[in-house]
């Protein structure tokens, strides 16, 4: 796959509508072309996962709700397919958050986690977590669980196995 957008969401809590940040990396002709990052004021606005990504209400209270983040993100994505590591999670966050704000999106999603599990070159890996697979392909994911860093890692993986 040479043209796609790798995307990653971080959520504030267990609710799929609680996206608190999004990172996206656009790839065209097999090269990273551009990136998009935004904090999001989540709904509902309470934090359970600060220990994972470090974000809290202090970070996202000044941010826009997703209904304001979606138009520039949608423009950034354009007509490209989406790629995520564990796409069932990210696609459900996108779908549920869009539905909450009255939007929809039928962009196809591809999963680098599923592809990694099926890739014969990766059979000896300890696990197929994002940082493990990214490291195999030479990407140092120093800021794991920062949405843009995770999207960049996903893009690198996708360029190798999709």
Model-found features: residue ranges?
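Conserved non-catalytic scaffold segment of RNase H-like nuclease domains
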Residues: 1-107, 127-145
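Short alpha-helix plus adjacent loop in nuclease-associated cores
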Residues: 110-128
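Active-site catalytic microenvironments for nucleophilic, acid-base chemistry
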Residues: 97-100, 118, 136, 157-161
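Short alpha-helix boundary/capping motifs
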Residues: 77, 101, 111-112, 122, ...
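Short Asp/Glu-rich motifs
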Residues: 69, 117, 153-154
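Short secondary-structure capping/turn micro-motifs that flank functional sites
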Residues: 66, 114, 150-151
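Acidic, divalent-metal-coordinating active-site segment for phosphoryl/phosphodiester hydrolysis
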Residues: 146-159
């Amino acid at each position: 796959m040479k043209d796609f957008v790798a995307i990653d969401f971080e959520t504030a809590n267990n609710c799929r509508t609680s996206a608190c940040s999004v990172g996206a990396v656009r790839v065209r002709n097999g090269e990273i072309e551009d990136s998009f990052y935004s904090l999001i004021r989540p709904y509902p606005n309470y934090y359970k996962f600060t220990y994972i990504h470090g974000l809290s209400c202090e970070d996202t209270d000044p941010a826009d709700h997703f209904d304001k983040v979606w138009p520039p993100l949608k423009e950034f994505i354009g007509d490209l397919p989406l790629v995520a590591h564990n796409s069932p999670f990210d696609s459900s966050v996108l779908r549920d958050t869009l539905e909450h704000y009255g939007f929809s999106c039928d962009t196809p999603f591809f999963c680098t986690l599923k592809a990694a599990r099926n890739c014969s070159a990766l059979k000896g890996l300890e696990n197929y977590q994002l940082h493990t697979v990214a490291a195999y392909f030479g990407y140092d994911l120093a800021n794991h669980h920062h949405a843009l860093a995770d999207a960049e890692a996903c893009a690198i993986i996708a360029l190798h196995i999709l």
